[in-house]
């Protein structure tokens, strides 16, 4: 586990982007992402993403706001994957070339960021599960009194 939240937060704070949603029907910019939320980097080709997916679905069903960043993935493969395994994301950004992910310092999938009003306050590389949630994310959510709903 690595926490590069300080470096990533600076980049994320000033990073303007305009990418399409996963369906290709709308454009999404940094201005569309407000408040507190989880940003999860995932791909249909990522085995570990499949392992963590049920936990993300559980978080989503509990009202946690999750934005998906679909990373270097084929749009149709990703849509099929979500139809098969459930869609826990409130919004999905399709980052086919990986440009936004690169700007965030992403080295692979899955990676998960906790975002507080446009600033990354936590960054986890690897599978998010109950233990990671309790040890990495929940203490920050509690200390900053974040509302992820």
Where do the model's predicted regions map?
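Thiol/disulfide oxidoreductase modules built on the thioredoxin-like
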Residues: 84-88, 95-141
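Structural microenvironment flanking redox-active thiols in thiol-disulfide oxidoreductases
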Residues: 50-85, 96-102
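Short active-site neighborhood of thiol/selenol oxidoreductases, capturing the structured segment around
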Residues: 28-50
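Single conserved hydrophobic/aromatic residue that forms the stacking wall/gate
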Residues: 1-8, 12
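Hydrophobic beta-strand anchors of alpha/beta hydrolase catalytic cores
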Residues: 38-39, 66, 112
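Non-globular targeting/processing and membrane-anchoring segments
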Residues: 146-149
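Short gly/ser/thr-rich secondary-structure transition/capping motifs
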Residues: 18-27, 91-95
């Amino acid at each position: 586990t690595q926490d590069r939240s300080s470096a990533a937060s600076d980049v994320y704070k000033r990073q303007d982007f305009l990418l399409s949603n996963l369906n290709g029907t709308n454009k999404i910019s940094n201005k569309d992402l407000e408040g507190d939320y989880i940003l999860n980097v995932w791909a249909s080709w990522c085995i570990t993403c499949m392992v963590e997916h049920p936990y993300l679905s559980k978080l989503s069903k509990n009202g946690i706001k999750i934005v998906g960043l679909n990373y270097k993935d084929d749009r149709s493969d990703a849509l099929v994957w979500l139809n098969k395994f459930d869609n826990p994301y409130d919004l999905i950004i399709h980052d086919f070339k990986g440009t936004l992910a690169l700007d965030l310092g992403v080295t692979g999938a899955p990676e998960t960021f906790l975002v507080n009003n446009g600033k990354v306050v936590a960054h986890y590389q690897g599978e998010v599960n109950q233990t990671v949630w309790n040890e990495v994310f929940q203490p920050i959510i509690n200390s900053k009194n974040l509302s992820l709903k």
